[in-house]
Amino acid sequence: MTQLKSQSSAEKQPELLRVHATASRFDPHFHSTYSIVAIKRGSAEIRSARWSGTARAGDVFFFNPFEVHAARCCEDDAEYDTLYPSKAFLVRCLSIDRSDGPLSIRTSLLRKGSATRELVDVLEAPRVEDKVIEVSLRRMLSACVFSTNSAEEGVGALVQRACMLIRRNCTRAMRTEDLAHEMGVHKSHLVRTFSSAVGMAPQTYMRQVRVAKAREFMTEGVPLSEVALMLDFSDQAHFTREFKKVYGMPPGAFSRALGKYRR
């Protein structure tokens, strides 16, 4: 269960969301943005379709948008900072001329060392401006490998198409049967192929895409009651249950920590 201590965002529509938290485990989930995680205390076993390994204090690891991953702390809770940069923020850090194509992080984990030390030290500060973080990120990212190919290119055309259809229809509830019918394949074939490639069943992926979109709306200051309606949750209680499954806390607690909750 995630135990959030603090969370801050510099902009109403943030290019860089920073979260400080402690956690004992995360069930399989994903985020709609890039994730850069710096372990401050403890260690955790990380697992995704792209990589798996143990991250320790001082290490920094990475996930691409919609990359399913899970974590379990080896002993006590782990304390960590997570940066959720937008694509525009990463493009600026990397000084890329074109920003309209895909961009994926190929590096999985950087071990504690000169490449990670500056960023970890910057994140130790109680208050730090985005510009300072950006400078530290730029230096650390120079040690990473990036690709202009899609991070999902290896999952197969069927799964890629299914993922895109789900994301494009994230404002409405969808059944696996409906998705399979729209794609012209049998439900069992879709479930088997999708689950193997992505790391979760399509129905779970659908719910989590809606929850990820809810989180985006919440960082923009959209009231919780409106978020639940916009994303076709049956009611506020349903939204709260699904959000807590993914992030380990109710959406109200997330919004208050973010400082964007409009009463």
Where are these regions (language model features)?
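Histidine-centered active-site/metal-ligand motif
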Residues: 29-31, 69, 186-189, 203, ...
